[in-house]
Amino acid sequence: MSEKIKVSCLGCGGTNQIAEEAVGKTAVCGRCKTPLPVPGRVLEPTEDQLAVLIQKAALPVLIDFYSETCAPCRMMHPILEALARRRAGNLMVVRVDTAAFPNLAGAFRIQAVPTFVVMRGGREAGRTAGAMSETDFSLWAASLS
């Protein structure tokens, strides 16, 4: 029997389980029929989708607040992508462009980029700012999720 991977719906926040061999194929939420995000990928949600994830997702949500013009932010992108693949089913990783979503940056009191915030059950579980090594970042994320 194949292993199941948990995925939170961007539409309703419901937790769905996808068979490992079905990852990458089109899947829809069992509750609201919204297409599900592919597990193991960094998501770029809308403000509304992020609000749903923060409030309703059963999985912790790691938010990367970044800017396209920030070199340390770009340096962290492959590290985040690797983390999303490794922690698929245990952690959702999302990316928020602070220039495109200034209201979100303000709501989260983002003062520098990159800033990483882990949300669990609608509450902030931790935050850190600045680029770091893949090992340090993975240890930090694991300690909070």
Protein language model annotation of sequence segments:
Residues L43-V61:
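A short beta-strand-turn-helix
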Residues A112, V117-S145:
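Non-catalytic, surface beta->alpha helical segment in thiol-disulfide oxidoreductase systems
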Residues G13-N16, L36, H77:
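Cys/His-rich microdomains that often coordinate metals
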Residues E44-P45, F65, L80-N103, I110:
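Thiol-based oxidoreductase modules, predominantly thioredoxin-like and allied folds used
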Residues F65-I79:
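Conserved redox-active cysteine motifs that mediate thiol-disulfide chemistry
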Residues A58, F65-T69, A112:
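Short pre-active-site segment immediately N-terminal to redox-active cysteine/selenocysteine motifs
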Residues C9-C12, C29-C32:
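Short cysteine-rich clusters marking metal-coordination/redox-active sites
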Residues I18-A27:
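Short linker/helix segments within small regulatory modules
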